[in-house]
């Protein structure tokens, strides 16, 4: 999983871009976490708790995206994917799941979060 972090010098906005099949992670980092160090640290602490066996799983529901963690992996997905549809959408109208959902290993997410934390901290 490859990623790149940038900061817009004019607006001060932090942006994360992730490799194909993980694009939604970039959106989650940029929009749901943003430059909030306390929120980033909270997720890192939860990952440590899961790795230590203190928790089995954890969920963080954001404005547009949700993070699910368990002992093996992280899943980030658009909140719209979590709802069952009462009717069938036309094929051309269906959500493009690859850009709305991604899985990665817990350790991979932890590494990316640590890098994001350092990037944001240096940019202040």
Swiss-Prot record:
Q: Which InterPro entries match?
A: UPF0231 (IPR008249)
What the entry lists under Pfam families is as follows: UPF0231
Kindly list any coiled-coil regions of this protein: none
What is the protein name given in its UniProt record? UPF0231 protein Shewmr4_0656
Q: Which family does it belong to?
A: Belongs to the UPF0231 family.
Species this chain originates from: Shewanella sp. (strain MR-4)
């Amino acid at each position: 999983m490859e990623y790149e972090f940038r900061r817009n010098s004019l607006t001060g906005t932090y942006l994360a871009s992730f490799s194909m099949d993980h694009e939604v992670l970039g959106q989650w980092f940029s929009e749901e976490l943003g430059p909030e160090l306390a929120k980033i640290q909270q997720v890192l602490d939860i990952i440590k708790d899961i790795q230590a066996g203190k928790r089995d799983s954890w969920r963080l529901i954001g404005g547009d995206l949700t993070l699910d963690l368990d002992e093996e992996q992280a899943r980030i997905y658009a909140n719209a994917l979590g709802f069952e549809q009462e009717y069938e959408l036309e094929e051309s109208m269906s959500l493009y799941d690859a850009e709305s959902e991604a899985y990665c290993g817990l350790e991979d997410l932890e590494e990316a979060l640590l890098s994001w934390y350092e990037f944001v901290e240096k940019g202040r």
